[in-house]
Amino acid sequence: MAGHSKFKNIQHRKGAQDKKRAKVFTKLIREIVTAAKTGSSNNPENNPRLRNALTAARSQNLPKERIDKALNSANESSNNENYTEIRYEGYAPNGIAIIVEALTDNKNRTAAEVRSSFTKYGGSLGETGSVNYLFNHCGVIQYPINIASNEDVLEAVIEAGGHDIISDDTTHTIYTDVENFSKVLDFFTGKYGIPEDSYIGWIPLNTIIIDDKEKAAKLLKLVEVLEESDDVQRVFGNYELSDDVYEIIQGEP
């Protein structure tokens, strides 16, 4: 795994998402509906994807009544909402690889929006598979650092069958193989409660350090615009901000 400093970028993006709570909720609800409709069962006990979606929703404080409404909606025979999972890959300026995961009911619309965003901010959208070799596809589970000691969490990772763990000043980040994600997430949820975040995503094998404020601002604007789309679930990139640039950007309104 690359160094933990890349999570500065995740935390920066997470902060931007927190300011757009309605959009975050929309994405969570879309995943719940999709998981309930496409899984083997609409019972989370028998549907790992739905169980994962519900855990993610609770970690973001999606109100219970909205979760229940989404589940009821998915079970209605009149519900014609069908979403397709699509992955877009391309490059931001300065050779930064970007992966965009989307759930959409209109592939043409979403592709046009994603392509337009890449172009507007100096990037280029490539073919699916053009950059994913630069990333590790894995499960990620995050807890606040004070949930337990590094040693205790490491023991839990080993017991649960996790792949790796990185602990920094604020966060325990647990990595899992995609195949074991649900099992490990269930174990940690039972032991430590709902995590701060949990998902299957793309973690860069190596990162490019951005040490120029203007370059960082342009890159983060592209990421922000992509994430503002209701169709986009998550955005990943193989970059990290230098300490100086990170502090400057964090200090801006």
UniProtKB/Swiss-Prot annotation:
Location, primary (coarse class): cytoplasm
One protein family per Pfam: Transcrip_reg
BP-aspect Gene Ontology terms: regulation of DNA-templated transcription
UniProt key word DNA-binding: yes
Region (Disordered): 1-21
Signal peptide, first to last residue: none
GO cellular component: cytoplasm
Keyword annotations: Cytoplasm, DNA-binding, Transcription, Transcription regulation
PANTHER family found in the cross-reference section: PTHR12532:SF11, TRANSLATIONAL ACTIVATOR OF CYTOCHROME C OXIDASE 1
Protein name in the entry: Probable transcriptional regulatory protein A1G_04400
Organism for this UniProt entry: Rickettsia rickettsii (strain Sheila Smith)
